[in-house]
Amino acid sequence: VSRDGRPIALQLEDEPRPMPGREVFERVLVLDEAKNFFTFVNVDAEPVPSLLRGFSAPVILAEPLSDDDLLVLLKHDSDAFNRWEAGQRLALNRLLGAIRGEREPVLDDAFIDAMRSVLRHPQLDPAFKCLVLSLPDENLLAEQLDSVNPQRIHAVREVMQGQLAQAHTAGVEDGVGDRRRDGRRRAFTDRLDVVRPDAVLGLEQ
């Protein structure tokens, strides 16, 4: 996808250029060697790769995506799993940084704005919105740490989840729908406790 969320036509080198309206925006690449190289041509915008779309096997892909790349995927990717995964990776980076004391336990505006775009998307399923807006759980966070402090992990996660709740309260009814009509739609706002950031700052790392 492009950085403004537009799908980019995919034409491999040595392929004829497709006629207007016959472009291909997704394709399967066969990896049958230890190393495979593919060159795309006539790429009309800076791309952000959305890989393994629709893939069902449990594969962990090592890809050098930056925070800016992940924010693009979170806001615009049409593949549900890739969109969710981008949000989880962004949240994980922020949570782990705060737990390790490398950053304040405060979510940045870019992340909150990207989450807001998910919440306000008119075509996304409400249950999927709740899933995307949920931060990685405490067990996953603990697995990423060399030294585990359960109290700090819990406190940092609660603070950041509370910040998401506060930031998006105004858009919940429009984005998630009438919670009285569908209990699934309560999953995001009803379980979020707003915790003060200073509750974390006093904890030892």
For the regions a language model picked out, list residue spans one by one:
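Polar, glycine-rich mid-to-C-terminal structural blocks
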Residues: V1-R22
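Long, ordered, helix-rich scaffold segments
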Residues: S2-R3, P7, T39-R185, R191, ...
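A broadly tuned preference for mixed-charge, low-complexity surface segments
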Residues: M19-E26, E138-N139
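A surface-exposed beta-strand-loop module
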Residues: R22, V28-V48
